[in-house]
Curated annotation (Swiss-Prot):
Binding site for GTP 2: 181-188, 228-232, 293-296
EngA-type G domain ranges (all copies): 3-166, 175-348
Keyword Repeat: yes
A biological process from GO: ribosome biogenesis
Name used for this protein in its record: GTPase Der
PROSITE patterns: G_ENGA
Quaternary state and interactors: Associates with the 50S ribosomal subunit.
Gene symbol of the encoding locus: der
Task performed by this protein: GTPase that plays an essential role in the late steps of ribosome biogenesis.
Species annotation: Legionella pneumophila subsp. pneumophila (strain Philadelphia 1 / ATCC 33152 / DSM 7513)
Keyword match Repeat: yes
Top-level taxonomic group: Bacteria
GO function term, MF aspect, one: GTP binding
Keywords: GTP-binding, Nucleotide-binding, Repeat, Ribosome biogenesis
Amino acid sequence: MIPVIALVGRPNVGKSTLFNRITKTQDALVADFPGLTRDRQYGHAQHENKSFIIVDTGGIGVDDIEVDTLMSRQSQVALNEANVILFLVDGRSGLTGIDQQIAQALRKFNKKVHLVVNKTDGMNEDIACADFQSLGITDIHAISASHGGGISSLLEEILEPFTTETHEATDDKAIKIAFAGRPNVGKSTLINRILGEERVVVYDMPGTTRDSISIPFTREDKQYVLIDTAGVRRKSRIDEKIEKFSVIKTLQAIKEAHVCLLLLDANEGITDQDMNLLGFIIESGKALVIAVNKWDGLEEDHKEKIKSELSRRLHFANFAKIRFISALHGSGVGGLFKDINEAYHSAIQSFSTPKLTRLLQDISAKHTPPCINGRRIKLRYAHLGGHNPPVIVIHGNQLDALPESYKRYLNNEFIKHLGLVGTPLKIEFKGGQNPFANKKNKLSQRQVNKKKRLMRWAKSKK
């Protein structure tokens, strides 16, 4: 399972800055589309081929009035699910009483804690860290979140115990499908409907938890693994069942999956939580199918309203198939696997370099790149750079000056001509290096001697 790293610390020590610095180290797999909502409290990141989830508890809050309420309930959920805790302190302010209280509170979690002394740029690191030795945390790191100093070595050390991510080696043939959605949208009902219709033998896979259950099954001689992120149900004081929604477990399921099935509730429309989940999936680059549940029984005007809202708010995810279903009664459920298979095969498809290069030439001839300083941007050739999502690498000159609008044009044209369905496409641009860049025009010794002879000859003629 992908590791989870939690950031904790008192306000204004730089948790959000470090979060942004770490999550920004991995380029987004797709363009930053207008209208795409991202939850900045949780994020995917990668360092040296090791993926992880990072949680910023800064937005969750720390109460510095009473020790008993030092951490909110949501903070404690995040810390309970974390594999590693990064405890941030301010190297310029020194040790405070709140820092001591937080350190005391962290001990009860029985987790690996790294003390991260931030804002040490321009300071002697040993002196900056010395003030915090009394906290009793052995792993101490000095960093500068704003300038990036020390972050690479910090990530290298905390990720060392975790293995490099290799999806291909974990499961050979089965298509992993993550069912993502808000509590009570019908994820478990849909999975039960699928399993009931197919009459398959279901067994629990080793290592599954109550929060995320993996269910393998076979349909039409194809193997699948359904990852249910429904969550833990607990009883409240008034004896009502309430579903505990874990963002972290959902993020882990999304990262493990080949295809994500986002379930929406037709009765409630598209909520902010739906948009946040969609943002996670888009950023992960996974293949996507959207299912609108509880479609049966709606009035026609309500259906039209939902379709209009989907078209307006999900325009940046127009690569995904949308299917209207009823998990309870089964209508539309059978067609989901057609969409899932299409999305999966599009995400893992391979294309030869000659084919991609010819397509690039045709696309750029149809709409030529703009000129920069009187010189036209040249797109020379393209090749495949990865799968799930498919990555196309384009080589050429002056690619740094290529406008975003032209990049979107290339993306849309490649998707259309390659017939990609249900998967985003990432395009990387690599410019050719000028071998004479930053080189001074230095004369050879022979040229120097010739120049001197000419100068002597010119003087003798005066």
